[in-house]
């Protein structure tokens, strides 16, 4: 349920047809969701409630066709890699990855690996990907290292295959998210 569904209007703008980020032409979102295990937490075994979400800002090759970007910090608690490049160049040069706090590094690396695998042999490439964190440590074995670079590839494939529809809630990087002691999610 959304605020607008309850008659609450925020701001002067109107949402697009889907009322999602994908209402912006070319924006695609994909998720890789990891859910396994039940019961008491055993580090390294679970239960696992986590994942990866990627936001691809346009239909072209975002690695070679960047988009303008900016940033603002509202809450200094949280990690988002790639911000200094955005501040310096004003450009986003790859998809945005979202995952749990302890998996930001592997998602960062997975975005680079995804780009490098698409390059012709011998091509030179550098990247400062944007990878951000969500807190899922209450519902997930956050210390178990369950997110892998393959999950980034899965989320990228899902974004490529999406027709603009965005799955929201307990998926991808929002699977185990908790916000102010309430169950949160993506979207």
Predicted regions and their residues:
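Alpha/propeptide regions of enzymes that mature by internal proteolysis
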Residues: 1-186
């Amino acid at each position: 349920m959304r605020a607008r569904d309850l008659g609450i209007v925020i701001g002067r703008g109107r949402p697009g047809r889907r009322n999602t980020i994908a209402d912006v032409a070319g924006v695609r979102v994909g998720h890789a969701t990891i859910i396994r295990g039940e019961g008491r937490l055993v580090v390294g075994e679970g239960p696992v409630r986590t994942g990866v979400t990627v936001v691809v800002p346009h239909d072209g090759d975002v690695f070679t066709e960047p988009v303008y970007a900016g940033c603002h910090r509202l809450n200094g608690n949280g990690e988002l890699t790639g911000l200094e490049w955005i501040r310096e160049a004003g450009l986003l040069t790859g998809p945005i990855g979202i995952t749990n706090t302890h998996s930001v590094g592997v998602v960062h690396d997975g975005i680079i690996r995804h780009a490098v695998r698409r390059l012709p042999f011998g091509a030179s490439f550098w990247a400062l990907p944007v990878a951000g964190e969500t807190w899922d440590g209450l519902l997930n074995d956050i210390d178990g290292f369950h997110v892998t670079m393959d999950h980034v590839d899965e989320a990228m494939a899902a974004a490529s295959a999406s027709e603009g529809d965005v799955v929201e809630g307990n998926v991808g990087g929002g699977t185990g998210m908790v916000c102010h002691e309430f169950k949160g999610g993506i979207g």
